[in-house]
Amino acid sequence: MAMFYAHAFGGYDENLHAFPGISSTVANDVRKYSVVSVYNNKYDIVKDKYMWCYSYVNKRYIGALLPMFECNEYLQIGDPIHDLEGNQISIVTYRHKNYYALSGIGYESLDLCLEGVGIHHHTLEAGNAVYGKVQHDYSTIKEKAKEMNSLSPGPIIDYHVWIGDCVCQVTAVDVHGKEIMRMRFKKGAVLPIPNLVKVKLGEENDTVNLSTSISALLNSGGGTIEVTSKEERVDYVLMKRLESIRHLWSVVYDHFDVVNGKERCYVHMHSSNQSPMLSTVKTNLYMKTMGACLQMDYMEALEYLSELKESGGRSPRPELPEFEYPDGVEDAGSIERLAEEFFSRSELQADEPVNFCNSINVKHTSVSAKQLRTRIRQQLPSILSSFANTDGGYLFIGVDNNTHKVVGFTVGQDYLKLVESDIEKYIKRLRVVHFCEKKEDIKYACRFIKVYKPGEETTSTYVCAIKVERCCCAVFADWPESWYMDTSGSMKKYSPDEWVSHIKF
């Protein structure tokens, strides 16, 4: 009976046949199959399109162009692959979106000793040519080759694998980037999306690393996390971590299976693609309530973004009507009007009472000069984006939240310029995802109002007043904490625009 061992699970054996992704007791020529079977489901091999797959094992690189089949169901590493007669011919190893490689004797291959050399993988963009370690348009590459021809060749230090839609190439370069060798395969291929991530528990930020890995794999079609731990009971430590972050999973249809081992555990991630949104740890979309600015969970974010998409954005908010407010009235409209008048003041008095409180459109806070820039960095993005996502509002820094009196903060002019620069910087970093045609920027105004004390003619005490208007579309305080696996095996974070583009409205 043929046996197959996945390299991803430590299955490399130098005494067995080795192919990209597997060691096996048999050497199957997988080029001869046109149909394969996985769990009694039949899948056609894709014609004239291949996957470049590779393993790093014992300082050895094993790479090859392999056949692939299309499957819309999630398959795990190690799942058996059979021919139509019921004979096992391979196991699941590599995946690119909905395509799975068939590991065994494939087409063009590359077997290297990695002692003293590196190897890098690239997607060859359509229309580009290659020289050594760079790709560009043909004329630029031609000039590059002429420039490098004058250099004497040196020993190879790096190999570069270029995978394109119509052709694949392997180049080797010396320390100066001079191309020493080139192989060209007239076959179109894709690179696999790595679907194995290693996490070690007991190290700093291990919970963050685990949640990031889960998000990245779920958003990339699934995969496996290999978990080790500094502690003896790796399975116990893992389950504690998973339980502590279970509330983060924004995709209820996604799930995982845990396979326990003595020294390591494997968490198999399965994404069914039934959820309307990506797996996300934090949306970084905030809304303002009466008492706080709250981060939207994924359902709130979906509802909010769906409304914006349906309406094509929001129109500017009309100006507040002018009218007098009876004593003691503290409705949202009167509070906002009083805040607007306070914002327009040219000067303030220390310990002056403020006749409005925090509301959905107003927030005031106090902070020492020493902590001012730190608090601005930590809190400004979420507060101002929450105003922009609601109906606009005012932030006053230097008003005591308990006594509702003006206290201000005392700083010099140079420091004040730094604070003003910080505020501008953090507002410009806010990301707006537009559903409208105008695509306007965030509108805001910032003032530093002098605070005078009785008997003092000059002052360097201020209240910082920031006014933010309602934004036409969705304002993100930062990029969503939602990741995916790229073809190099790195975890990348979705930009706000990318994240929204993946929502199934």
Swiss-Prot record:
Keyword Hydrolase tagged: yes
A Pfam family annotated for this UniProt entry: SLFN_AlbA_2
BP GO annotations: symbiont-mediated suppression of host innate immune response
GO molecular function, one term: 2',3'-cyclic GMP-AMP binding
Domain notes: The substrate binding site is formed by the N-terminus of a monomer and the C-terminus of the opposite monomer.
Top class in the EC scheme: hydrolase
Family affiliation: In the N-terminal section; belongs to the poxin family. In the C-terminal section; belongs to the Schlafen protein family. Subgroup poxviridae B3 subfamily.
Domain of life according to the entry: Viruses
Function: Nuclease that is responsible for viral evasion of host cGAS-STING innate immunity. Cleaves 2',3'-cGAMP which is produced by host cGAS following recognition of cytosolic DNA and blocks the subsequent 2',3'-cGAMP-mediated activation of TMEM173/STING, which normally spreads to adjacent cells and activates the interferon and NF-kappa-B immune responses.
Up-regulation conditions: Expressed in the early phase of the viral replicative cycle.
Self-association and partners: Homodimer.
Region (Schlafen-like): 239-505
Organism: Cowpox virus (strain Brighton Red)
Site for Substrate binding, residues: 60, 105, 149, 169, 182, 184, 186
Region (Poxin-like), start-end ranges: 1-238
Reactions mediated catalytically: 2',3'-cGAMP + H2O = Gp(2'-5')Ap(3') + H(+)
The protein, known as: Poxin-Schlafen
Further details from the record: In some poxviruses, the poxin is expressed as a poxin-schlafen fusion protein.
InterPro entries xref list: Poxin-SLFN/SLFN_N, Poxin_vir, Schlafen, Schlafen_AlbA_2_dom, Schlafen_AlbA_2_dom_sf
Top-level taxonomy: Viruses, Varidnaviria, Bamfordvirae, Nucleocytoviricota, Pokkesviricetes
